Amino acid sequence: MASQEHPNWLTALLADTRPPPKLFAWSPANIQPKLDEGIDMGSSNSDEEYDNDACVCPSTDSDQRIYIIGPGNIGRLYATHMARHPNALPITLVVHRKELLSQWAACEGVGLADLTSGKIFLNKRFTVEWWTETRPPYGPVKEVADGKKLHNVFISTKAEAGLSEADRIRRYLGRCSSVVFAQNGVCKLWPPHGPLYISHRYPSGDTPTFSACVVSHGVASAGPFLSVHAAPADAYIGPVFWASDPESPWRQPSDDFFIRHIATTPLVNTKQVSSGEIWLLQLEKLVMNAAINPLTALLRYKTGELFTSYGSDDPLARVIDKLLWQTSAVIQGLIDHETSHSVITSYAEQMSQPGTSCSVPKVRKKLTERFSQPILKAKLYAFGLKIFEHRSSMLQDIEAGRKTEIRDFNGWIVDTACFLGTGLDVSVHSGLTGLIERCERFDKMELGRALL
């Protein structure tokens, strides 16, 4: 079978030859004729911490400012704690709807309830903007970053919107820009498709540094600008694509300012890793998401309920087994593919002892074992039982009537199998994608009949 040349998202972007749009940065002042500057935040007590005085005041200095695009649960988590960084920088929250500007004006700021400490962190010392091609009819007229370049961008939207958001702002990105994707799924800028996208959208020598942040913290929404940090965990950050130094083209951006800033942000426990390691971590998280999310959504189960039976007579256990065999085959095929050589080499160099050369074939063999079906199954069952009461994000999306991330989980498996072009069976992933998009609901027996 011949491999597919490009996935649909890349085909659409390659066909788009329009110049990047000029974007206006609306603020609450564009919604209300005058916004009261003095907002009573109340008096603090042992259960509430207000960061009014601790946070850096708003500044027009876009060289230092952090822009968080998509301040949902993960965005609020990082905004809250980046504002408490020992060397805190001014932060702008970029919302996706105009109405959120009015809601921001009326609320007490970003709220993060920490269940471990029992504290509620409240902070209103952020700038909030809505970026649009529409010029505001009244109030101050301001272009994004005053028409200059954005330096520190943290994109924490749903996975589907991540690259489209970065693409929309490419007018304001360049070699000085560091863009971090903190989302589920596998970043679209990895080989094999990322380099072609970059060369199509950016002039040579003016490419931003693009990184991925894999977040394991459990954070739930409790309303607009309010989240609950229910399950503290850890996170990892590493580079995906960067403008190489002609003198040392293989050198990774370990000294990238924004990556270091995130890695030193208190209380989010974000570890800086190599390009190869962050790729593997994204793949491992994808394995969990591609199993747990669609199955819990279709069965309306809590996560742990998926893993109460190993028996071959249980239709759900058989579905999980087959799904993992298919996942394993696709990821192993990707590991062996020539387009993965650079990230495999990055990981091999990280794993090698000082003064010794790395063996890429040996590393590939170890990674093939790491993504074997029995290993993936053991990790999945252990993880699922550990978070037994957890309600997956896809289950919550289905119940709320929202669009899911199924195309970035199981759809990615299907697309990658198509790219590899070796005739791999991905029928379970393809079937799950269709069932989720039709908002089906099954019991275990019905699910087995639909997928086996």
Swiss-Prot record:
Superkingdom of origin:
Eukaryota
Q: What is its EC number?
A: 1.2.7.-
Induction, per UniProt: Expression is highly repressed by the histone deacetylase HDA1 and the beauvericin cluster-specific repressor BEA4. BEA biosynthesis is also repressed by the activity of the H3K27 methyltransferase KMT6.
Active site: which residues? 285
Kindly list the positions annotated as binding NADP(+).
70-75, 405
Q: What GO molecular function terms would the record report? A: 2-dehydropantoate 2-reductase activity; NADP binding
Q: What happens when the gene is disrupted?
A: Decreases the production of beauvericin.
GO cellular component, alphabetical, reads: mitochondrion
Function, as annotated: Ketoisovalerate reductase; part of the gene cluster that mediates the biosynthesis of beauvericin (BEA), a non-ribosomal cyclic hexadepsipeptide that shows antibiotic, antifungal, insecticidal, and cancer cell antiproliferative and antihaptotactic activity. Ketoisovalerate reductase BEA2 catalyzes the NADPH-specific reduction of ketoisovaleric acid to hydroxyisovalerate, a precursor for beauvericin biosynthesis.
In the record, the note on similarity to other proteins reads: Belongs to the ketopantoate reductase family.
- Tell me the protein's name: Ketoisovalerate reductase BEA2
